[in-house]
Amino acid sequence: MRVPHLGLVRLLLVGFAMVAFGSGIGAQTSPGPDGWRIAGRDLDNSRSQPAERQISTENVHQLVPKWVFTTGSDVSATPTVAGNAVYFPDWAGNLFAVRADNGDLLWSHQISDYTGVPDTISRVSPAIFEDLLIIGNTNGVSWLSSASGAQAGAHVIAIDRHSGALRWITQVDAHPAAAITGSPVFHGTAVYVGVTSQEEGLAKDPAYACCTFRGSMVALDVFTGKILWKTFTVPDNQGLTNQYSGNAIWSPPAIDPGRGSLYIGTGNNYTVPDAVLQCQQEAIASGNPNPNCAAPDNFFETVLALDVATGAIKWARKLSAFDAWTVACPPTTLPPAPVGNCPALFGPDFDFPGSGPNLLHLPAQPEGPAADLVGIGQKSGIYWALNPDNGAIVWSTSVGPGGVTGGVQWGTATDGTRIYVAITNAQHMTFTLANGGPRIDWGSWAALDPRTGTILWQVPDPTPGTVDPGAVSVANGVLYAGSYSGAMYGLDAATGAVLFTFASGGSVIDAPSIVGGTVYWGSGYRNIAPGIGNNKVYAFTIPKAGK
């Protein structure tokens, strides 16, 4: 099936078929073991599928497409699955529901049908709650200044998953550049969504009045869309451009029902007050690398634990000393010098991007007692493990080079035995892979021991020169990882050996969902060079004997 491309302006850096879906879902308070209902599959944001038994290291090399669905543009969100339906958006502004068994279209809608803004898309995995789909939107750059009132900014949208009809829509942030890039997560009767923005990219225009956006986490009633609470990550700037701004939330949270906590990582500041810049500059001149210049409620590059019921901050662990940055700063500028809206003192842009936290559960072993950890990857290339009760750093591991478009980007995974991390290395920095590996200057994947952070294995992308910002998923001993080269890989989760390779036709930045012996995987991402566009979602399976 083909749909027309809308000519959507790419973002800066930064009658319908009705088919029965089978038996009903029943009461639902959190993602269950069946299907793949949210981006990370479970509240731990593990991106793992413990129920998978059909595809293994022994037969993953036999995977073949059982169907291929053609979209209107790139697909960068992990498809979600419930019953005999698969849901995913594309970068042409479409939202699709297709049959899981054969890929036939059930229905499709333009996101603009819900928002009233022509140039708008969704780039998140639809959360499946009972008979609802929950998504968020990103307005196209051409509409950031013209959309106003209720149409402006970021919205959370609930849709009837059987028909595509709108149930409710809530504006969660009216800032014109506000957007939703972190997939919604539900628990109980609330849905939780982080708010980011495109203002960091708009700042490259010297005429743009930079910057006023404030990152936040929002909880909404899943049935009505009423905002239950909203917690900001930046002090109130009163809409002034010479104050604190930024600290976007790009990713989905992890939720710990036992502790009543929600964990999330934040982005960098776009701007800070002049007094903070002066304090930082004086500290650097005096040899103090970690001055206490910023306001205590300026939560840049911070892991936050929020009360899941109220949004109150339980603890905050800042993991960078200072980082104010926009796209007007090096190395994204040519020549590499600050221009326009770059702060006078700028940082490395080591935010916590699309790679949300993993809630890790360590069983009792001779090496140590049972314990929980909050793990999270950063664009610095570091994976951190924190105490979920107080945010204390338990361990940290530098897995590979960091950078503006480097380090850990779109999503890590864990199966309880290992943590799986992709390293982008878009700056092509030469480094040595762990455990006597080769020296490379491109992307790689690694597995870490969740108790110690030790790198158990690390392997290069088989295509020299390519980068690997994409998320990963794991199921039944197989790690699924996509490459900017266009390849989809299945690796042995225990060793990193490549067992399966498929040329998808476009850069692969999403991780697949794995349900009932089928791998659902999107292809195409041209938003950041040198990405390769495509318009495909693949469903892979092991052919049955005799077919």
At which residue positions do the language-model features occur?
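Short loop/turn segments that connect beta-strands within beta-propeller blades
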Residues: 99-102, 160-163, 221-224, 308-310, ...
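Blade/loop signatures of beta-propeller domains
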Residues: 28-65
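Bacterial N-terminal signal peptides that target proteins for export
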Residues: 1-13
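A structural motif specific to WD40 beta-propellers
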Residues: 64-66, 104-108, 165-169, 228-229, ...
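Bacterial N-terminal signal peptides
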Residues: 10-24
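Beta-propeller domains
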Residues: 55-61, 90-111
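Surface-exposed loop and turn segments in beta-propeller and other repeat-based domains
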Residues: 110-117, 171-175, 227-244, 312-348, ...
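Repeat-blade elements of multi-bladed beta-propeller folds
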Residues: 33-41, 72-94, 118-156, 176-209, ...
